[in-house]
UniProtKB/Swiss-Prot annotation:
It is found in: Cytoplasm. Binds 1 Mg(2+) ion per subunit. This is Bifunctional protein GlmU. Homotrimer. The gene is glmU.
Amino acid sequence: MLNSAMSVVILAAGKGTRMYSDIPKVLHTLAGKPMVQHVIDAATKLGAAQVHLVYGHGGELLKQTLKDDKLNWVLQAEQLGTGHAMQKAAPFFSDDEDILMLYGDVPLISVETLQRLRDAKPQGGIGLLTVKLDDPSGYGRITRENGKVTGIVEHKDATDEQRQIQEINTGILIANGADLKRWLSKLTNNNAQGEYYITDIIALAYQEGREIAAVYPARISETDGVNNRLQLSRLERIYQAEQAEKLLLSGVMLRDPARFDLRGTLHCGMDVEIDANVIIEGYVTLGHRVKIGAGCIIKNSVIGDDCEISPYSVVEDAHLEAACTIGPFARLRPGAELLAGAHVGNFVEMKKARLGKGSKAGHLTYLGDAEIGDNVNIGAGTITCNYDGANKFKTVIGDDVFVGSDTQLVAPVTVGKGATIAAGTTVTRNVADNELVLSRVPQVHKQGWQRPVKKK
């Protein structure tokens, strides 16, 4: 069916006392981003014309964190219930648009479920998302008459017969803007809590003869809310299990799906293998036949075909061409670039540095602000000294250079093609092509040398 224009209201004003945190509840992260951002993303993908975010506790931190110019911020200074929150947003509703109500602490709601809810909303009626639970204790029950939804009864107000009902209210609903504003204006707070409940509009709509259509989510976990860290950790595992399942079914080999975390977006080629305890963050692309070892962290990086990242390496904002090998225990920081066949070994760190085709930095090395040519050997313990305490400077190393162990290159400095830097050298001046450079204290031999002994 053809959907009307739609705006979304996200309720995010609660403090989240049971989180025991100074951070607003909806800013606690799931899969690397705030819970409320998951909900905003779903609303955006659904095609919302406007997203109204109802906020209260920690509003300034919310604005600093989300930084979304498209959000309409609606202040609920005093939290007097879900109906009160919607009343605050109501002045922004257009009469001819549908309004979808979501929650900032229900992060797993899917676009597919919301689209089915949107499609099911009757003309002039309400679309309501409900679920059936084996143990519905504490939840508002959905009452029906001849199969039609007639209202929602809170658990504390329900009769013994009504408490046997397993269908409960999730709080997620959609209705026309004009109808919603009218029903919201009729809400009262004549209850023990002195709050305005959005659930009361169901009975108001039924009294007007409006149809209420109930829709079930694809998975019950989509409607699970978060009130404490235990619930958040459970949703994290549910989310990660779903992501792992999708990857496995698409051909990615996860050696232990229960110990894999995806905190962003991952694109994989054919025959990719990922070992246990790997974390993927941001936007990551893995080419064909890439192997990621145990305990690695890959963030916002492109890894070319046939690359192998050995265990416990960290790769962030880096670009690797085909057939590169990394680690174990290597760190590629932002701006690291490896050309085809390059190798970075254990305890090597790179930042804003390019390592040419077939070049190697095998052990215990720092390469920062450096441009290194093809077929270069960087010996163990080499350091590009790029910082003078105030400014950064660049080191340039040409093709086919051999850099011996324990070398310091004090930038700015250029080493020409084919040059050889002897072990233990400190390079402070440019080196010409094919030169040998060495700077060492002369080696002294003392025959019959006696070591000092401790005095008794």
